[in-house]
């Protein structure tokens, strides 16, 4: 064991352990330099020991310092060009301006902080607008540490925010309504302009087609005159003036009736009906074999196509004119132009030359029920065929144009009726006025020197409705007076006058009802009462204003007397009743004199007398249990008459009416008690 204790893994000799001295008290900083230097003579030893000792410089040399110097002194050559090696370019980073940081969102959703222990929580408007807001959690987080006063302040702030939001919503609704009305007017105006543009484009297309056809056919001969009917007008007759056009058309139809037997049965006389072309002689062909069947003659009218057969006149017939022509025309078929289709048969291919030659100058008339007839000109390559086809197309186009115009006029009239009726359902009850709306849709009225149509009246009605809805009564009354003045000035336009009066009167009733309700609520304020009565008088509802005001004052008397409670002192109770009655009557008469015209004062006096009579009934009922002309009875009567003297200040003397016929009042005497079957 002793040998093992002598064995050690450390190499070399063991050094002697350092000796640690006991701690010493340091009275000053340790000197960094010259610590063993003795103090100067005459110097304070404490100052000498307080001087700092400089730190010795680091030792130079060493392996580590050489490596560090060599590392920092190494140079690296910069490459001339750095290649990306074909890597794609760096994608563009998205902008973070559109994204809100999480801290901001969290802070926005947190309940509002409180500035102090005595201040109510501030309402976070942005947090309230959050669609995912949960009210229970929001209130719990905001008012978790709030006091009763802070909760009340927070509730009042919420009410203010609610009121402000309601006001903003109402203003937004009215602004949207105004913009909607304005946009509707612009859309209606644009619709009318587009309709006019469509009509102009249609007319331009028709005129352009006619000009091209006329230019293409200018070198062809014009259609011949009616050979058999000499009265039918020729091309020279068509050059007559427009004033004689109706007479010319009438003479054409008379000549047609005379020249074509039975034509009046198919073509009765109508306004504007005239002959467009006498196409001359034609031959009717068989539909299957294309063989000739009989001789025909075609007449084209502006709205019909007449086919007449040519027959020989019998010379030995009774009443026959020997000097007349040998051939006569008999009406065979007649179709409206819009019900038939005229097809050129020259475009149909035929195998045989004879068939092709026959159909080269033929047309097919396809009528109602797919019934078709083929007609060929007598003369080969007769220009009447091309002219007939051209005139048929032009006549059909004119008819369709007329139908479109008529349909658009009817639609416009129907739109006008629907427009006015939809805006005012009460107009449907005015059948006479509703039937004339299509006639007055384009009527112009003079307003302040300018011509306006009835749509302007509708715009004024819209503004009036807005004023009534917003309770701008002064503006509404002024607008009503303006419209009534315009209606009175339309002496030559009875229909427009009735229309405006109907619209204005309907709004007047609604406006008067609203002002009447306000009058009943504010009858105790003389200024507001005078203003409301003035509005109703200007609207022509002074009777309604008078009745509403007096009814409201009667209700006030009834309510005030119900507040008087009898507590055993009859004299005090009669004093309160008489004071309420005569003071309210005094104030009512005084306000009535300042608000209503003098001719209506009789109604107010009658109302005051009725109220005094009602007071006498109550007085007689209360004094019926007292001794007649006793002390209590006398005191109550004197007090009532003293209060009745208030009416003398407004020009009424009802003192003699107080207690009148009081002794006539007899209370109902109750009989003796009646038992069960015993009297």
Curated annotation (Swiss-Prot):
Main localization, broad class: cytoplasm
Coiled-coil regions, chain positions: 142-208
Record-level GO BP terms: exocytosis; Golgi to plasma membrane transport; protein transport
Region annotated Disordered, chain positions: 1-123, 214-237
Compartments reported by the entry: Cytoplasmic vesicle, Secretory vesicle
InterPro entries: Cullin_repeat-like_dom_sf, Exo84, Exo84_C, Exo84_C_1, Exo84_C_2, PH-like_dom_sf
Pfam families in alphabetical order: Exo84_C, PH_EXO84, VPS51_Exo84_N
Gene Ontology annotations for the cellular component aspect, listed alphabetically: exocyst; transport vesicle
Positions with biased composition (Polar residues): 74-84
Keyword Protein transport: yes
Keywords attached to this entry: Coiled coil, Cytoplasmic vesicle, Exocytosis, Protein transport, Transport
Function of the protein: Involved in the secretory pathway as part of the exocyst complex which tethers secretory vesicles to the sites of exocytosis. Plays a role in both the assembly of the exocyst and the polarization of this complex to specific sites of the plasma membrane for exocytosis. Also involved in assembly of the spliceosome.
Subunit structure: Component of the exocyst complex.
UniProt similarity note: Belongs to the EXO84 family.
Name listed for the protein in its UniProt record: Exocyst complex component EXO84
């Amino acid at each position: 064991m002793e040998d093992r204790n002598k064995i050690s893994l450390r190499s070399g000799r063991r050094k002697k352990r350092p000796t640690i001295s006991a701690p010493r008290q340091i009275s000053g900083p340790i000197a960094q330099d010259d610590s063993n230097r003795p103090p100067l003579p005459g110097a304070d030893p404490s100052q000498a020991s307080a001087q700092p000792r400089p730190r010795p410089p680091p030792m130079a040399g060493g392996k580590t310092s050489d490596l560090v110097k060599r590392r920092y002194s190494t140079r690296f050559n910069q490459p001339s060009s750095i290649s990306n090696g074909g890597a794609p370019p760096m994608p563009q980073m998205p902008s973070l301006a559109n994204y809100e940081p999480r801290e901001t969102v969290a802070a926005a959703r947190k309940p509002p902080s409180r500035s102090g222990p005595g201040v109510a929580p501030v309402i976070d408007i942005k947090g309230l607008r959050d669609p995912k807001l949960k009210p229970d959690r929001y209130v719990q987080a905001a008012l978790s540490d709030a006091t009763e006063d802070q909760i009340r302040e927070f509730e009042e702030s919420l009410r203010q925010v609610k009121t402000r939001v309601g006001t903003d919503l109402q203003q937004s609704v009215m602004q949207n309504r105004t913009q909607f009305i304005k946009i509707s007017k612009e859309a209606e105006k644009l619709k009318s302009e587009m309709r006019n543009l469509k009509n102009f484009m249609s007319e331009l297309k028709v005129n352009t087609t006619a000009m091209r056809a006329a230019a293409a056919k200018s070198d062809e001969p014009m259609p011949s005159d009616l050979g058999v009917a000499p009265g039918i007008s020729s091309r020279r007759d068509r050059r007559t003036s427009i004033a004689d056009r109706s007479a010319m058309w009438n003479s054409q139809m008379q000549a047609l009736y005379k020249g074509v037997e039975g034509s009046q049965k198919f073509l009765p006389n109508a306004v504007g009906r005239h002959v467009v072309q006498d196409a001359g002689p034609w031959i009717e062909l068989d539909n299957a074999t294309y063989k000739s069947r009989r001789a025909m003659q075609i007449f084209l009218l502006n709205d019909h196509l007449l086919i007449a057969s040519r027959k020989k006149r019998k010379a030995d017939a009774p009443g026959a004119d020997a000097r007349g022509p040998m051939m006569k025309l008999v009406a065979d078929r007649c179709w409206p132009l819009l019900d038939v289709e005229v097809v050129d048969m020259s475009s149909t291919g035929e195998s045989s030359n004879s068939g092709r030659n026959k159909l080269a100058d033929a047309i097919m008339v396809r009528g109602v029920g797919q019934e078709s007839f083929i007609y060929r000109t007598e003369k080969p390559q007769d220009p009447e065929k091309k002219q007939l086809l051209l005139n048929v197309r032009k006549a059909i186009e004119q008819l369709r144009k007329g139908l479109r115009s008529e349909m658009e006029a009817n639609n416009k009239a129907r739109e006008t009726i629907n427009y006015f009726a939809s805006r005012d359902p009460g107009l449907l009850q005015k059948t006479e006025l509703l039937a004339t709306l299509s006639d007055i849709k384009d009527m112009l009225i003079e307003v302040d020197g300018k011509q306006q149509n009835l749509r302007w009246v509708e715009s004024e009605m819209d503004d009036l409705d807005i004023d009534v809805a917003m309770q701008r009564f002064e503006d509404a009354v002024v607008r009503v007076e303006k419209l009534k003045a315009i209606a009175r000035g339309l002496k030559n336009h009875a229909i427009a006058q009735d229309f405006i009066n109907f619209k204005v009167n309907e709004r007047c009733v609604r406006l008067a009802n609203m002002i009447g309700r306000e009058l009943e609520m504010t009858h105790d304020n003389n200024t507001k009462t005078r203003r409301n009565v003035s509005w109703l008088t200007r609207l022509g509802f002074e009777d309604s204003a008078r009745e509403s005001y007096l009814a409201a004052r009667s209700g006030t008397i009834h309510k005030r007397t119900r507040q008087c409670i009898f507590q055993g002192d009859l004299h005090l109770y009669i004093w309160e009743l008489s004071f309420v009655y005569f003071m309210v009557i005094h104030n009512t008469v005084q306000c009535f004199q300042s608000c209503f015209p003098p001719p209506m004062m009789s109604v107010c006096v009658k109302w005051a007398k009725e109220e005094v009579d009602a007071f006498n009934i109550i007085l007689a009922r209360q004094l019926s249990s007292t001794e007649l002309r006793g002390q209590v009875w006398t005191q109550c009567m004197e007090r009532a008459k003293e209060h009745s003297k208030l009416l003398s200040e407004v020009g009424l003397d009802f003192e003699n009416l107080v207690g009148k016929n009081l002794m006539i009042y007899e209370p109902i005497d109750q009989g003796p008690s009646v038992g069960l079957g015993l009297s």
